[in-house]
Amino acid sequence: MEYKKTLNMPKSGFPMRAGLPKREPEMLRYWEQLDLYNELLKKNEGKPLFSLHDGPPFSNGALHMGHALNKALKDFINRSYAMRGYYTPYIPGWDNHGMPIESAIIKQNKLNHKAMSVAEFRSACHQFADHYIDVQREGFKRMGVVADWDHPYKTMDPGFEAREVRVFGQMYKNGHIYKGLKPVYWCPHDETALAEAEIEYQDDPCTTVYVKFPMNDDLGKLPHLDKSKLSFVIWTTTIWTLPGNLAIALHPDESYAVVKAPNGEMYIMAEALTEKVMGIGGFDRYEIVETHPGSFYENMLASHPFLPKTSRLVLADYVTMDSGTGCVHTAPGFGADDYQTCLRYGMDMVVPVDDQGRHTDYAGKYAGMKTEESNPVILQDMKEAGSLFASQEIVHSYPHCWRCKKPIIFRATPQWFCSVESFKDDAIAACEDVRWVPSWGKDRLRSMVLERTDWCISRQRRWGLPIPVFYCKDCGKPICTDETIDAIAGLFEKKGSNAWFEMEAEDMLPEGFTCPHCGKSAGFEKESDTLDGWFDSGSTHYAAMERDQGFWPATMYIEGLDQYRGWFQSSLLVAVGALGRGAPFKECLTHGWTVDGQGRAMHKSLGNGMDPAEIFNKYGADLLRLWAGSSDYHVDVRCSDDIFKQLSQNYLKFRNTAKFCLDNLTGFDPEQLVAAADMQELDRWAVTRLNSLIRRVFDSYDAYEFHAVSHAINDFCVVDLSSFYFDIIKDRLYCDGENSLSRRSAQTALFLILDAMTRMFAPILAFTCEEIWLAMPHRSADDSRSVLFNCMVQPYEDYALPEDAMDRWARIAAVRSAVNGALEQARADKTIGKSLEAEVDVTVPAEDAFLADMDADTLADLLIVSQVRVTVGDALTVTVAPAQGVKCARCWKVLTSVGTVAGHDTLCPRCAAVVKSLPVVE
């Protein structure tokens, strides 16, 4: 007889090879036919709400690994909440306006954008943005992200624009928006103001200079000193700003020394910095003639080093003694502190640089030069004039534009601002009501809000939402009222914001409208600037989430670390400043950057980038999801081909675990689970270990520690199942009677394990777990259409073993490990071949004496040997010898009982009984 046919051999239609690149698109089609997103909402309708508000990516390019990490984490969160009984609407969004789109379309199409009409340019931008929305959407769908992809929000949609106009109007009405001449970050290349979040710092070489400003008027306070030899020494790293100097700032309470050099010249500088500065000037000998507090010099005048004007001595508390000379070069057109200080002293604003970064006529001979071109010329002029005290070549961190990557300048221009100071305390207080992950996020955002100046919200661009303000041609004052806001919002709702550029001001305003300031109706002009893109995205919680979905605040925001300065902050400021509410999110979670395998930023120039589309085609989306779900995203997340190859091995361990369960559950009815009292203790041990895994996974999902979920499931598959439990139960599964209690006991454990693991891992391994779910048997209460329609299971407490029993199994595992080591050595010594050819003698210490009382056949099965003897001694020892008896032709155990059942000379009694119970086998 061919006894192989009498075995319960593993069989299922679940393939060992994943073939994810081919299989996943089939699953996507299945989900589309199922209408997965809407069916999920129907399934959980009426349950507690979990709302993750999507931070909108720019629609200006294909997916990159940062996009993939972000959307994967969002999908993990939404799926895990859905499977824990929450209603999880998720509307994806895109940020469409601003420089990223303009720069991309100009670069791609090589357009002379200044020669295009506004309508032509905006139409091109709109088409470009729409194209990349489609590109990115298809990439996110390929990842398996569950969302309302047919109804995303877009910041360029007319409805969104209309609502954003109302946000602006409310913030204006609240007194938080004004127009003023103040220094802002300015990009000369793109000719626009920039927000702080649009600045990147790079290390640049630079010439730093120490410059002499000769004393001009000492107010009669220093009659004993020769004024012709007395100078204040300032220090700067931006030579080009010197033509704009109007003042020198000193700290009122610090001591300032008059220092006499061997050449007879005298220099005024902070006493605390004298040794350092004089050393830089090449003086190892000098004399401190006298000292005075900074306040002593207030309102004195110094002569400009190379222009025919004076510089006033002013006081400022921000002057520090950690660098420079303690005498701070002050140019109100180029610095926020400088501006405020000069404003306090009633000095006029001077901005000697134009939109393109060229000096104006105010700068004299340097007029027409770009700022970077003027640096060496000014330096040479100061050398020739004898006004250069010293210079040094250094490398310093300097701000650059995030789009064009070129250096920016700080320049005073007329701009629209949001006065953050007026509601800063409320914004900071709102942070207290938020759960921050990680916890230090609260302090980071609080400190940024605390330190920030007023928010420059205007941009000199054409592709953006127009600032909805009119100007009266008669009195010149700006107009923004409830009436005008209602008119513009209604117009944009119907025609979009292009109407602003296509219609005359009078045609947009209500009939008979008059200026609220002067009462005239002679005519009106439109504001030409557009809103900062951060105002767009900062308004999404109102313009998209609340108005479209009907809830506020969001349960969660999750974005990269840079969004403390960007979207998190702009959303908070809009919520507090415009709506008068708290934070627009209850929880705020952040993740790190994606970097290459060596921890470097990924750049085209380095050739170290990874394309999500290539990963889909080579490994499958589930491997990309596993990468995101196995990484500690609180720090920078590394990605490389080697990392994905290693993840493939981890993936196969889980897949093979699932396949083992599925193969051995063929024909099993989950409605007929074996009761705990009837299960073998080993099977209850496996379920008890599963219970521990369930608790760890639930805790990890609650903490958004997805890497802990992945690692815990991987460890369970490798350590508890593959290396221990599965090996032991194979004999029972294959050789015991198909419907025997012993086999059904093991199948019950396998079902509970597979069912729980598939549900727990489904938020991360979405495609594979769905494939498993569709292949496995189910209970009648389950929704067999999708694993996502089912809740994660709670621990099976009825099956749990008590703690003392689990301790006993830990000792059994330790003994088994020692036996395995001895078996390996015996195989190496050619004493035995397979472990079933062995007989082992085990000596155990007194604390393991319970092993001597165990049924010998049961213990032999646990150790996967044919025979075992246990004695109690001083320490654990194992001796291996060939088993005595005959090899069973069916189960391959070597036993003395083989052939003792009549008619079955080559079988052991167990196998003989099983074969006798079967129908006749040919």
Where do the protein language model's features map onto the residues?
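Alpha-helical recognition segments enriched in aromatics with Gly/Pro capping
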Residues: R312, Y345-G357, R461-W463, D486-D636
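N-terminal catalytic cores of NTP/NDP-binding nucleotidyl/phosphoryl-transfer enzymes
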Residues: K42-S103, E164, I234-L242, V314-T341, ...
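Residues immediately within or flanking Cys/His clusters that coordinate Zn2+
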Residues: V184, Y398, I467-V469, G512, ...
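Residue patterns forming the tRNA-binding/recognition surfaces of aminoacyl-tRNA synthetases
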Residues: E2-L20, E26, Y30-L34, I106-P243, ...
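Short cysteine-rich clusters marking metal-coordination/redox-active sites
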Residues: C187, C401, C472, C515-C518, ...
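Acidic, turn-prone loop/beta-hairpin segments
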Residues: D95, V184, P188, L194-E200, ...
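Protease-associated
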Residues: A247, E254-C327, A336-Q340
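Cys/His-coordinated zinc-binding microdomains
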Residues: E191, Q460, G476, G519, ...
